Amino acid sequence: TASAHRDFYKEHFPRFSDRRYRSLMEFFSLPDNKPLRSFSLGQKNQFEVIMALSQGADYILIDEAFAGNDIFNREDFYKVLSGILEDNETVILSTHLIEEVSSFISRAVLIREGSITGDIKTEEIENSGKTLTSYIKEKYNYRGDRVSKALDDITGEAE
Protein backbone atom coordinates (compact mmCIF):
# COMPACT_ATOMS: atom_id res chain seq x y z
CA THR A 1 0.00 0.00 0.00
CA ALA A 2 0.96 3.64 -0.28
CA SER A 3 1.10 3.94 3.50
CA ALA A 4 3.47 0.94 3.74
CA HIS A 5 5.81 2.66 1.28
CA ARG A 6 5.53 5.88 3.29
CA ASP A 7 6.46 4.02 6.48
CA PHE A 8 9.48 2.45 4.75
CA TYR A 9 10.66 5.86 3.53
CA LYS A 10 10.10 7.44 6.95
CA GLU A 11 12.30 4.74 8.48
CA HIS A 12 15.12 5.10 5.92
CA PHE A 13 15.07 8.83 5.13
CA PRO A 14 15.45 10.87 8.33
CA ARG A 15 14.35 14.08 6.61
CA PHE A 16 11.17 12.52 5.19
CA SER A 17 8.35 15.08 5.28
CA ASP A 18 5.13 13.40 6.34
CA ARG A 19 3.33 16.72 5.99
CA ARG A 20 4.41 17.10 2.35
CA TYR A 21 3.54 13.46 1.68
CA ARG A 22 0.03 13.78 3.10
CA SER A 23 -0.62 17.11 1.39
CA LEU A 24 0.45 15.80 -2.01
CA MET A 25 -1.50 12.55 -1.57
CA GLU A 26 -4.60 14.60 -0.82
CA PHE A 27 -3.92 17.05 -3.65
CA PHE A 28 -3.72 14.22 -6.20
CA SER A 29 -6.57 12.29 -4.52
CA LEU A 30 -4.49 9.15 -4.09
CA PRO A 31 -5.68 6.53 -1.60
CA ASP A 32 -3.26 5.73 1.21
CA ASN A 33 -4.66 2.27 1.93
CA LYS A 34 -4.96 0.73 -1.56
CA PRO A 35 -2.34 -1.63 -2.98
CA LEU A 36 -0.06 0.16 -5.45
CA ARG A 37 -0.71 -2.56 -8.01
CA SER A 38 -4.30 -1.30 -8.21
CA PHE A 39 -3.15 2.23 -9.15
CA SER A 40 -3.40 3.36 -12.76
CA LEU A 41 -0.18 4.25 -14.60
CA GLY A 42 -0.84 7.93 -13.97
CA GLN A 43 -1.46 7.33 -10.27
CA LYS A 44 1.74 5.28 -9.99
CA ASN A 45 3.72 8.11 -11.57
CA GLN A 46 2.10 10.64 -9.23
CA PHE A 47 2.94 8.45 -6.26
CA GLU A 48 6.58 8.07 -7.30
CA VAL A 49 6.89 11.85 -7.59
CA ILE A 50 5.25 12.31 -4.18
CA MET A 51 7.76 9.93 -2.62
CA ALA A 52 10.69 11.66 -4.34
CA LEU A 53 9.53 15.09 -3.19
CA SER A 54 8.85 13.91 0.37
CA GLN A 55 12.11 12.14 1.19
CA GLY A 56 13.97 15.32 2.14
CA ALA A 57 16.78 15.12 -0.41
CA ASP A 58 18.67 18.20 -1.55
CA TYR A 59 18.70 16.93 -5.14
CA ILE A 60 15.64 15.26 -6.60
CA LEU A 61 15.83 13.53 -9.99
CA ILE A 62 12.48 13.19 -11.74
CA ASP A 63 12.39 11.36 -15.08
CA GLU A 64 9.33 11.98 -17.27
CA ALA A 65 7.42 12.73 -14.10
CA PHE A 66 3.89 12.72 -15.38
CA ALA A 67 3.85 10.40 -18.34
CA GLY A 68 0.38 8.91 -18.46
CA ASN A 69 -1.27 11.99 -16.95
CA ASP A 70 -3.52 14.46 -18.71
CA ILE A 71 -2.50 18.05 -19.32
CA PHE A 72 -4.47 19.32 -16.31
CA ASN A 73 -2.65 17.07 -13.84
CA ARG A 74 0.69 17.94 -15.43
CA GLU A 75 0.03 21.68 -15.23
CA ASP A 76 -1.13 21.35 -11.62
CA PHE A 77 1.98 19.34 -10.78
CA TYR A 78 4.28 21.99 -12.24
CA LYS A 79 2.54 24.70 -10.21
CA VAL A 80 2.74 22.66 -7.01
CA LEU A 81 6.37 21.79 -7.69
CA SER A 82 7.26 25.46 -8.15
CA GLY A 83 5.48 26.36 -4.93
CA ILE A 84 6.74 23.73 -2.50
CA LEU A 85 10.48 23.60 -3.10
CA GLU A 86 12.70 24.87 -0.32
CA ASP A 87 15.82 26.95 -1.07
CA ASN A 88 18.06 23.93 -0.46
CA GLU A 89 16.13 21.66 -2.87
CA THR A 90 17.06 21.27 -6.52
CA VAL A 91 14.94 19.29 -8.96
CA ILE A 92 16.58 17.77 -12.00
CA LEU A 93 13.71 17.14 -14.38
CA SER A 94 14.10 14.95 -17.44
CA THR A 95 11.33 15.53 -19.96
CA HIS A 96 10.41 15.72 -23.61
CA LEU A 97 7.54 18.12 -22.85
CA ILE A 98 9.67 21.21 -23.40
CA GLU A 99 6.92 23.80 -23.80
CA GLU A 100 5.23 22.65 -20.59
CA VAL A 101 8.30 23.20 -18.42
CA SER A 102 9.94 26.16 -20.12
CA SER A 103 8.09 28.74 -18.01
CA PHE A 104 9.46 27.59 -14.66
CA ILE A 105 12.88 26.03 -15.20
CA SER A 106 15.98 28.08 -14.51
CA ARG A 107 18.44 26.08 -16.57
CA ALA A 108 18.32 23.67 -19.49
CA VAL A 109 20.90 20.96 -20.05
CA LEU A 110 20.47 19.10 -23.32
CA ILE A 111 21.65 15.52 -23.60
CA ARG A 112 21.78 13.69 -26.89
CA GLU A 113 23.15 10.20 -27.37
CA GLY A 114 24.78 10.32 -23.94
CA SER A 115 26.59 13.63 -24.40
CA ILE A 116 25.77 17.14 -23.23
CA THR A 117 25.03 19.21 -26.32
CA GLY A 118 23.79 22.34 -24.59
CA ASP A 119 23.80 23.94 -21.15
CA ILE A 120 22.19 27.34 -20.72
CA LYS A 121 20.30 29.36 -18.15
CA THR A 122 16.80 30.16 -19.32
CA GLU A 123 17.45 33.84 -18.59
CA GLU A 124 20.12 33.79 -21.32
CA ILE A 125 17.64 32.30 -23.77
CA GLU A 126 15.05 34.95 -22.94
CA ASN A 127 17.62 37.75 -23.28
CA SER A 128 18.58 36.47 -26.73
CA GLY A 129 14.96 36.67 -27.90
CA LYS A 130 14.80 32.94 -28.55
CA THR A 131 12.54 30.30 -27.09
CA LEU A 132 13.74 27.13 -25.43
CA THR A 133 12.37 25.15 -28.36
CA SER A 134 14.28 27.23 -30.92
CA TYR A 135 17.46 26.88 -28.83
CA ILE A 136 17.03 23.10 -28.77
CA LYS A 137 16.38 22.94 -32.52
CA GLU A 138 19.53 24.95 -33.13
CA LYS A 139 21.65 22.75 -30.85
CA TYR A 140 20.27 19.56 -32.42
CA ASN A 141 20.69 20.92 -35.98
CA TYR A 142 17.00 20.38 -36.64
CA ARG A 143 16.09 20.67 -40.30
CA GLY A 144 12.90 22.68 -40.73
CA ASP A 145 12.27 21.21 -44.18
CA ARG A 146 12.39 17.65 -42.88
CA VAL A 147 8.62 17.05 -43.01
CA SER A 148 8.06 18.59 -46.44
CA LYS A 149 10.90 16.50 -47.90
CA ALA A 150 9.45 13.34 -46.35
CA LEU A 151 5.98 14.16 -47.69
CA ASP A 152 7.42 14.79 -51.14
CA ASP A 153 9.16 11.42 -51.00
CA ILE A 154 6.06 9.63 -49.72
CA THR A 155 3.59 11.19 -52.14
CA GLY A 156 5.99 11.28 -55.08
CA GLU A 157 5.29 14.96 -55.73
CA ALA A 158 8.98 15.86 -55.86
CA GLU A 159 9.48 13.86 -59.07
Where are these predicted regions, by residue range?
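Walker B catalytic motif
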Residues: 64-65
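H-loop/switch region of ABC-family ATPase nucleotide-binding domains
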Residues: 95-96
